[in-house]
Amino acid sequence: MFEIIVDSAANIPAELCKKYKIKVLSFVNLVNGKEMTCFEPDLTPEQERAKGKEYYDAIREGAEVKTGLISSGIFEDTFREIIEADKDILYFSLSKNISGNYNSARVAADAVLDDCSNGRKIRLVDSLNASLGQGLLAIYASEMREKGMSFDEVADTIETYPARLNGVFTVGNLKYIARTGRLSGTTALVGNMLSIKPILRGSKDGYIVQFRKCRGRKAVLNELVNLLCDNITDPENQIIGVAHADAYEDSLYVIEQIKKRIKVRDVINTTYDFCTGSHVGPESLAVFFMGKDRELGGGGRGAPPLSFFFFFLF
């Protein structure tokens, strides 16, 4: 027996967490000084979308949002309870190169295993990603568990997936990246005036990398579709993910265009998680899929790659 755990940045809708028996540890944000739990286990998809609209509207209106790590104490209490119940643990983290959450979990896991002598295991998987790039790994692991694979078989197999699970996204307004200090306010202002839309992706090392640029919202959405369709492998056996920061109509458009070109097993369409979403801002939209690697080709349609940058979320 083993438990699959994610943090709420994995962006798995509540109903799917129940279906796949995935435990979620929630981030807690401060919004204008008031605590907000990022994941609520009993929300319907409609309620999740409504909560997302409320949250991203608050950001549009200038709310002060502060994010933080899940403490090693919370990890330790959670891990200890499961290990003492004689179960192994498989935990999927945000990329450790954009968050310190992996290290918090590592400290907790070491402390629990030092105290426990029942032979149970804790394995941590660095997703090298965020949002559904993290969540899809947990879902695939759950499917393997359901098929009867052992803990080590699942962990050994799923550890090969992050190198092929691509995350590609765009932002709605450059000012939110400027607020992180990784883009000047002047550059953001000019970029917005010219309707320059960047495309970013997760690198093979789990950093956020600026990849391409487009002119206009529809063009950048089409380019996300191109990149997915040109690089996905075995789509008929894949679940693809679409996450949006209160850009529901755009997410439906992207899914419609993808389905016109390829057949996929399933699509998860969800509101972008509130922790990482606060750093990229409203109208951000991401797609997630398995490719042969994370060195994306295709797409482009003449748009040259840009130099890379990376930033820590927390």
Residue ranges and their predicted role:
Residues 297-302, 311:
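Intrinsically disordered, glycine-rich low-complexity segments
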Residues 3, 9-17, 22-23, 28-36, ...:
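Mixed-charge interfacial surface used for oligomerization/domain docking
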Residues 306-314:
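Hydrophobic alpha-helical signal peptides and transmembrane signal-/tail-anchor segments
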Residues 60-96, 103-107, 155, 162:
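Glycine-rich phosphate- or other oxyanion-binding loops that anchor nucleotides, phosphorylated ligands
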Residues 93-95, 125-128:
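Short beta-strand->loop
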Residues 3-74:
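N-terminal glycine-rich anion-binding loop in soluble enzyme alpha/beta folds
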Residues 1, 85-88, 263:
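Short loop/turn motifs at secondary-structure junctions
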